[in-house]
Amino acid sequence: MQENYKGKAYDILKNLNIEEGDLIEIKKGDLRIRGILLPSYSKDDRIFVIKLDNGYNIGISIDNITEIKPIEKKSSKDRESERREVHNGAKSEIKIISTGGTIVSRVEYETGAVRPALTTEEIIQFLPEINEIAKVDAEVLFSILSENMKPEFWVKIAESVKKAFDEGNTGIVIAHGTDTMAYTASALAFSLRSLQGPVVLVGSQRSSDRPSSDSAINLLSAVITAKYAPFGEVVVNMHAESSDTYALVHRGVKVRKMHSSRRDAFQSVNDKPLAKVLWKERKLVMLNEKYISKKDETLLDAKFDNRVFLLYYYPGLDRDFLEQMLTNTKIRGIIIAGTGLGHTSSDHIELFRKATKDGIFIGMTTQCLFGRVNMNVYTTGRQLLDAGVTPLEDMLPEVALVKLMWVLAHEQDLEKIQNLMITNLVGEINPRHTLDLFPRWSYE
């Protein structure tokens, strides 16, 4: 199979009966390069794409190649011999639900490309150590990029979690893309109450075809958490540092992705992580004694009203533009990420007053992320309070947004909406901050 190659490169492969997925060796002068031939999607028809043993993909120009030869045909590789024991027919303890992302992807030996592991057997093949921890079962709910996540998908995930608990599983692992994983964690936390066990969201910052991949450690740590954690909460389980020593378990309504690419991108904000996972020792160590205990029966209440928006205040926010948004008849609620203790320009206060009188909920969070809103300190804050803006304590803006979607789907009366938004339902509000909750960056 050479259909992804064209021109001169195609002719060379055809003459040597080399196909994509074959192990080949290329000689250019004194340099010998060995790897798996991958599909080429380059417009240049004089390039071979090779996956090296170290996991990296490289392109090699056919110019000045002195020799190219097949080493091993893909069809001769007995991949079945790599399969490990799977608990077929046995009742699973941990359900792994895949929604997309790279966390449960694996290298496809036929081509060297990466694709999702679709079955329990493939996950065990990808990470056989799971068998040492628990009997697992896997389900692909859907496979989407996390930026395409929507409230209706949150409902489907919540329903699948409820079903998995009803089937007798004691813990759930949800594979998810990292970019919007914190949103989904919040949505599930409000949708699923009295959890019978941990619901662990896990993702990967580096795909499994890269030497620095965090996929295996994160997934293994998530299964350890789902198996041994004493809490019945929705959590996020991710790498804790740049090395591979341990992972951290973050409360789902107190976590945020704080770096675009680092493996330890996820951090607890205004709260301590619930636990750390020593994956080599297969051990979970609790770090936070304040957690929601497991209950006897999981309650499902998953519905959302997405007629909301998140307003990130900035100097110069146009009043007319804001007025157009506030007078949109579809809007039922607004979360403001305000400055400092919870402020916007005083120019906008009367617009907010009119909106709240019209029944629109307006909640205030802080752009600072760390710390809490206090609108009683300065004049502008007090004026915003008088205009009907509701301070939302130390809630993260994204968590407040998801919570508002959930609350609006359950209540119509503004006063009841306000009361629910300031009620600590699942740990989204931390009433007491200690000095150690704020990270200190060292430049020494």
From Swiss-Prot:
Q: Ranges for the Asparaginase/glutaminase domain?
A: 92-424
The biological processes this protein is annotated with in GO are: amino acid metabolic process; regulation of translational fidelity; translation
Keywords, A to Z, come to: ATP-binding, Ligase, Nucleotide-binding, Protein biosynthesis
Name the InterPro entries on file. Answer: AsnA_fam (IPR006033), Asp/glu_Ase-like_sf (IPR036152), Asparaginase/glutaminase-like (IPR006034), Asparaginase/glutaminase_AS2 (IPR027475), Asparaginase_C (IPR040919), GatD (IPR011878), GatD_N (IPR040918), GatD_N_sf (IPR037222)
Q: Which Pfam families match?
A: Asparaginase, Asparaginase_C, GatD_N
Which residues pair up as cystines? none
Q: Which family does it belong to?
A: Belongs to the asparaginase 1 family. GatD subfamily.
What this protein is called in its record is: Glutamyl-tRNA(Gln) amidotransferase subunit D
